[in-house]
């Protein structure tokens, strides 16, 4: 009670809304505007309003560019005194904000808040596209680029763009021709110390990134991140055409070719094109005329061991690929993939003429012939 009397005497002007006390009537009047929503101080440049004149004055510096608060150490200027105080900690090394969990200290309150999420596990920034949540807004911004494909960091030398500034910096070393980091094992040189460290793992066999789920270890973070999606089921790469999602960007790129019909891999021997490099590699063996794999049943020869294994199932009747939905079995994985579309109703093959969609590429080809016949008759 005694302490309450002291407070009442020191702050005689009380707010009837929240009970907060002030030393003078002017301060109370100013405070009450926060409750009634009154904002009498308006910026003549952009129309934004404020409850206090001091807030308006600070805001106007955005338009005028005025920076009246200057650092005595380095001369850097700021529009707000609070920003100068924060900046000065760079020179003084002062870190007044301490973590209660691990006692680590920080120069900014916002840095402490970000750090505390390591202990609490709080992830307040969810992705609107896939629901994945992040502890920092910067991490969410970077993640968004997976969905948008945005690459805001452009190389001024060659025009190549990147989703992260660190990737651009690493790339720019290619143009500088300065390769000061050399591997002692094989004498190979690198532009960046990080590139050398990654390379050295090929010699040492070091795999510092270990999966908590299965214990598998990796030498590089990208491979580790991709692997973790096996356990989490995360598929951040979604096809804009049909909505199908993938855990790797390379798999999405390959899939999109089913819609676009793009076949960038060309056989130099016969001109045949393919949507995947692996398909071209297999095809090239046709021209080499080497068929080292022979069937023991019928003596038929094959270019590839996988082709022989598939063929042998015609003799054994083996059907190792089973549908989880209905239990039907197939001798080929491609046949199972086609069959599954009966259950999923997926129709990945779209006609560019009329927009009709089909389960199988053969159905699309048959359909497209109807357009060709109509065009021929029209001529």
Swiss-Prot record:
Localisation per UniProt entry: Nucleus
Any one GO MF annotation of this record: RNA polymerase II cis-regulatory region sequence-specific DNA binding
UniProt main location, coarse: nucleus
SUPFAM superfamilies for the chain: beta-beta-alpha zinc fingers
GO BP, one annotated term: regulation of transcription by RNA polymerase II
Domain of life (superkingdom): Eukaryota
Keywords per UniProt: DNA-binding, Metal-binding, Nucleus, Repeat, Transcription, Transcription regulation, Zinc, Zinc-finger
Keyword Cell inner membrane in annotation: no
Pfam families: zf-C2H2 (PF00096), zf-C2H2_6 (PF13912), zf-H2C2_2 (PF13465)
Task performed by this protein: May be involved in transcriptional regulation.
Family affiliation: Belongs to the krueppel C2H2-type zinc-finger protein family.
The protein's name: Zinc finger protein 883
Gene from which this protein is expressed: ZNF883
């Amino acid at each position: 009670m005694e302490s309450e009397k002291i407070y009442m005497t020191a702050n005689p002007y009380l707010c009837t809304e929240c009970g907060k006390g002030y030393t003078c009537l002017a301060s109370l009047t100013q405070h009450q505007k926060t409750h009634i929503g009154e904002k009498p101080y308006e910026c003549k440049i952009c129309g934004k309003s404020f409850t206090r004149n001091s807030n308006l004055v600070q805001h106007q510096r955005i338009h005028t560019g005025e920076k009246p608060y200057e650092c005595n150490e380095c001369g850097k200027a700021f529009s707000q005194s609070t920003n100068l105080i924060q900046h000065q900690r760079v020179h003084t090394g002062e870190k007044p904000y301490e973590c209660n969990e691990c006692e680590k200290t920080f120069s900014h309150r916002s840095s402490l808040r970000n750090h505390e999420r390591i202990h609490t596990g709080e992830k307040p920034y969810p992705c609107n596209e896939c629901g994945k949540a992040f502890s920092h807004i910067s991490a969410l911004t970077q993640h968004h680029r997976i969905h948008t494909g945005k690459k805001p960091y452009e190389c001024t030398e060659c025009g190549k763009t990147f989703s992260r500034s660190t990737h651009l910096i690493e790339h720019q070393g290619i143009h500088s021709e300065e390769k000061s980091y050399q591997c002692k094992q094989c004498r190979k040189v690198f532009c960046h110390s990080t590139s050398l460290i990654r390379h050295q793992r090929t010699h040492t066999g070091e795999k510092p990134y270990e999966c908590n789920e299965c214990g598998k270890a990796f030498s590089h973070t990208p491979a580790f991140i991709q692997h973790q999606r096996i356990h989490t089921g995360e598929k951040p790469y979604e096809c804009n055409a049909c909505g199908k999602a993938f855990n790797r960007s390379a798999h999405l790129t390959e899939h999109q070719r089913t819609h676009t019909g793009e076949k960038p891999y060309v056989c130099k021997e016969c001109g045949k094109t393919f949507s995947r490099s692996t398909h071209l590699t297999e095809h090239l063996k046709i021209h080499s005329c080497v068929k080292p794999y022979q069937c023991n049943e019928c003596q038929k020869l094959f270019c590839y061991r996988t082709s022989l294994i598939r063929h042998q199932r015609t003799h054994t009747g083996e059907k190792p690929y089973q549908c989880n939905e209905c239990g039907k079995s197939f001798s080929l994985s491609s046949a199972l993939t086609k069959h599954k579309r009966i259950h999923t109703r997926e129709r990945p093959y779209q006609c560019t003429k009329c927009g009709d969609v089909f389960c199988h590429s053969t159905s699309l080809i048959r359909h497209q012939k109807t357009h060709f016949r109509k065009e021929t008759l029209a001529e």
